[in-house]
From Swiss-Prot:
InterPro entries: Tcp11. Belongs to the TCP11 family. GO terms for cellular component: acrosomal vesicle; sperm flagellum. One of its GO terms (biological process) is regulation of sperm capacitation. It comes from Homo sapiens (Human). This is T-complex protein 11-like X-linked protein 1. Residues 1-36 are annotated as: Disordered. Pfam families: Tcp11.
Length: 502
């Protein structure tokens, strides 16, 4: 039996990057084959199912763009060619059965059974009359009897199914169903029906997600806490990595000094507003400050380190994406600061010029992490040309050969991690994110670091994503963090006793 077009979760990392699940080597296939859930204990299967439910619920709540979409395998890929060959083989077999004398309806009956189940799954709870009608018109036993007597009218049933689909489908599928109505070949028609029904099931899933999202958001904290507690009861060591993560955060925060680069002088107004223990290492850190330091450390996480905190595993991909965006913003802001120092304020007062320069730099720095030297060579040349043309268009004095060479050199030096400008920008950005956690976005924007004003929009967007994600995590796992931190920070020394979000 062929399956209808499969769907996948949009944020499945194995699909999001390549458009299809990553192919496995023969060794990997054998290994994955040996680990079959059917061969595992019921407890393990139950745990996997619970984790899956928790992950999907969490995804719906924290990702407003979450939806299910159709998987389209690349036509020239091994998977694509294999799937197409298997589908064609089945439909050719169905055609042979229907054309045989007398006709063989074995496969057709199985297809009609699948169609019936799919149609019933698309009905809403109160559509009982339509449910009874489908049950009667596509009664499996009755169809089987008709097939045995050679009286199964496949074209008539297909037209009936098309009418039902037109009644039940979302407007976006009207055109697809109209095209099906023009198909006269019964095999091609059934094939088209199965495909569009698969899309309609996907539409129903997305409609359900959209409808239930407000309810899930209202009850997500309690639900995630309850599910995690169930998992913790079965596996008491489930917080081991979380404990290590918070222990490191406590160590990091006690070694910071208020005069260190982590508190840029240009943001002194924000330092003054930090709670006790936030910027003075002579006092013990508060549990909340330790937790926020831990959150910030996630943006520096080594991808090779498998000891990722269990309480944040569901957000690991999102945090990696935020870390990449942070890195890209650091490079972007560094480039803009260097370019402005050479071209002057007048040119950078032009929103059109700044937007054009930002767009160019963003596009060229996509591969900065993997090819830093080559990337910055391209960036330096392009930025130099943009600055030269911008000054010329505004009737300003263009850069001399000496200044142009210096501009190129300073831009290319951004490649180095120890580059002064890049280091300062990185510290400003992280300090801004820390203040977002402590004081919220609105207050943090009032004290926005002047050196980052050219990326205020992009950084504010990053800050919102990071703040909302960590706020939800703190609401769910705050009680667990508080319990762990009691053993890391002595209660008599701690500045506070809980880690509830502000």
């Amino acid at each position: 039996m062929p399956k209808t077009e499969e769907t996948v979760l949009q944020n499945d990392p194995s699909v999001a990057e390549n458009g299809a699940p990553e192919p496995k080597t023969p060794g990997q296939s054998q290994k994955s084959k040996s680990f079959c859930l059917d061969d595992q204990s019921p407890d393990l299967i139950e745990t996997v199912n619970e984790v899956s439910k928790l992950s999907i619920s969490h995804e719906i709540v924290v990702n407003q763009d979450f939806y299910v979409e159709e998987t389209i395998l690349p036509p020239n890929s091994v998977e694509g060619r294999f799937a197409e060959a298997m589908y064609n083989a089945f439909w050719n077999h169905l055609k042979e059965q229907l054309l045989s004398t007398p006709p063989d309806f074995t496969c057709a009956l199985e297809l009609l059974k699948d169609v019936k189940e799919t149609l019933l799954s698309l009905l809403l709870p109160w559509q009982n009359r339509l449910r009874n009608e489908i049950e009667e018109a596509l009664d499996t036993d009755l169809l089987k009897q008709e097939a045995e007597h050679g009286a199964l009218d496949v074209p008539h049933l297909s037209n009936y199914i098309l009418n039902l689909m037109a009644l039940l489908c979302a407007p976006v599928r009207d055109e697809a169903i109209q095209k099906l109505e023009t198909i006269r070949d019964p095999v091609q028609l059934l094939r088209g029906i199965l495909r569009v029904l698969g899309l309609m099931k996907m539409d129903m899933v997305n409609y359900t997600i959209q409808s239930f999202r407000p309810y899930l958001q209202e009850h997500s904290i309690q639900y995630e806490q309850a599910k995690f507690q169930e998992l913790l009861d079965k596996q008491p060591s489930l917080l081991d990595y979380t404990t290590k993560w918070l222990t490191k955060a406590a160590t990091d925060i006690t070694t910071l000094c208020p005069s260190s680069p982590d508190s840029p002088s240009s943001s002194c107004s924000m330092v003054c507003s930090l709670p006790s223990g936030a910027g003075n290492n002579s006092e013990p850190p508060s549990p909340t400050m330790v937790l926020y330091q831990g959150y910030l450390n996630l943006l520096l996480w080594d991808l090779e380190n498998v000891e990722f905190p269990e309480t944040l595993l569901m957000d690991r991909i999102r945090l990696q994406e935020l870390a990449f965006q942070l890195h890209q913003l650091t490079v972007l802001a560094s480039v803009l600061l260097v370019a402005r120092s050479f071209s002057g304020e007048v040119l950078f007062r032009s929103p059109e010029f700044v937007d054009r320069l930002k767009c160019t730099t963003k596009a060229l720095t996509e591969e900065f992490i993997s090819r830093p030297e080559e990337t910055m060579l391209s960036v330096s040349e392009q930025v130099s040309q943009e600055v030269h043309q911008g000054l010329k268009d505004m009737g300003l004095t263009t850069l001399s050969s000496e200044n142009t060479a210096s501009l190129l050199g300073q831009l290319q030096n951004i490649t180095k991690k120890e580059n002064c400008i890049r280091s300062i920008v990185d510290q400003w950005i992280r300090f801004f994110l820390k203040c977002c956690l402590l004081h919220g976005m609105q207050e943090s924007l009032l004290h926005f670091p002047g050196g980052l004003i050219l990326i205020e929009k992009e950084l504010a967007e990053l800050g919102w994503k990071f703040l909302n994600l960590m706020h939800h995590n703190q609401q769910v796992f705050g009680p667990y963090y508080a319990e762990i931190l009691k053993h890391i920070i002595h209660p008599a020394q701690a500045q506070e006793t809980d880690v509830e979000p502000n």
